[in-house]
């Protein structure tokens, strides 16, 4: 992301277009670089550009532009555990969930999920290539590494079990099937003994999957300041989910759109006031 003389007040941004042709954009002393590549892309680009842990970058032979040990740290995601039930009658999904229309209606699948919102567990992002921005980075979220997250998952799975025991769920049981409580599961079934913490904890760990609510890597107060400027670097901001230490309980899209509009108006106001 940086090229040439870094401290001279001018920055070059190298990018490629859809045809693979490289271009160089020159940012003047009153301009800014706004990085909004998301919780995965923004810390990756900073590391590739030489902004990160000095020891880590040096181990990859990446020239250190600015030592910032928290880039790529505190990566988190809202973990999800779900059950999939095979049911014997056509089941109409929400239109928002339809990916394609199948020609066969022999089997219907119902999915019920529980989510651990605002996890305390976090991990890190590392580069898989020290030169290629298109190379997928290595990310570990360390789901349930904090005992509090695992405890919340156990409570959520038990809530799923309580719901499965209600009369309203009887219609989803598979006639003549002697499986777990009369239900046919696609994939792992709920633990047979919900009162056993160890069994439910094992279930949480073995069935966890992502909700694609990635955040962290460029946290406010650790990598960027309250105005989302990268601390120690002039004219560079990160404005996306990588700055969040916690996400809202639902899909973060609206929150991120709000952040973009808020920061856009704020930067325009700052520029008018500086003229």
Descriptions of predicted regions:
Residues 232-248:
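Short FAD-binding loop at a beta-strand-to-alpha-helix junction that anchors the flavin cofactor
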Residues 17, 37-38, 49:
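Glycine-rich, N-terminal phosphate-binding loop of Rossmann-like dinucleotide-binding domains
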Residues 114-126, 215-237:
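FAD-binding beta-loop-beta segment adjacent to the flavin cofactor pocket
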Residues 43-118, 129, 146-198, 202-214, ...:
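Mid-to-C-terminal "cap/lid" subdomains and adjacent gly/pro-rich loops that border
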Residues 1-19, 73:
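A conserved short coil-to-beta-strand element within the FAD-binding core of flavoproteins
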Residues 19-32, 36:
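Core beta-strand elements of the Rossmann-like FAD/NAD(P) dinucleotide-binding domain
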Residues 246-265:
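A conserved FAD-binding loop/helix module that cradles the flavin
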Residues 19-21, 144-151, 249-254:
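Conserved, non-catalytic sequence blocks in retroelement Pol enzymes and Pol-derived host proteins
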């Amino acid at each position: 992301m940086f090229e040439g003389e870094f401290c001279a007040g001018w920055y070059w941004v190298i990018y490629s277009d859809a045809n693979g042709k490289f271009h160089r954009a020159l940012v003047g002393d009153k301009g800014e670089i706004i990085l909004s590549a998301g919780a995965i892309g923004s810390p990756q680009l900073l590391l590739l550009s030489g902004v990160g842990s000095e020891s880590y970058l040096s181990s990859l032979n990446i020239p250190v532009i600015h030592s910032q040990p928290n880039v790529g740290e505190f990566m988190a995601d809202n973990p999800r555990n779900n059950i999939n039930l095979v049911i014997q009658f056509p089941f109409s999904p929400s239109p928002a969930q339809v990916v394609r229309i199948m020609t066969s209606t022999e089997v219907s699948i119902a999915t019920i999920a529980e989510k651990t919102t605002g996890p305390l567990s976090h991990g890190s992002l590392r580069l898989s290539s020290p030169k290629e921005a298109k190379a997928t980075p290595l990310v570990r979220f360390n789901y349930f590494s904090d005992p509090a997250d695992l405890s919340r998952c156990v409570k959520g799975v038990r809530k799923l079990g309580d719901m499965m025991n209600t009369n309203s769920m009887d219609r989803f049981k598979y006639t003549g099937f002697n499986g777990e409580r009369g239900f046919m599961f696609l994939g792992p079934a709920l633990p047979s003994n919900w009162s056993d913490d160890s069994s439910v904890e094992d279930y949480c760990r073995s069935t966890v999957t992502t909700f694609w609510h990635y955040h962290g890597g460029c946290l406010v107060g650790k990598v960027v300041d309250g105005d989302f400027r990268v601390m120690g670097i002039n004219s560079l901001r990160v404005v996306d989910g990588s700055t969040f230490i916690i996400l809202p309980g639902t899909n973060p899209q609206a929150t991120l759109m709000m952040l973009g509009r808020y920061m856009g108006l704020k930067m325009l106001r700052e520029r008018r006031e500086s003229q």
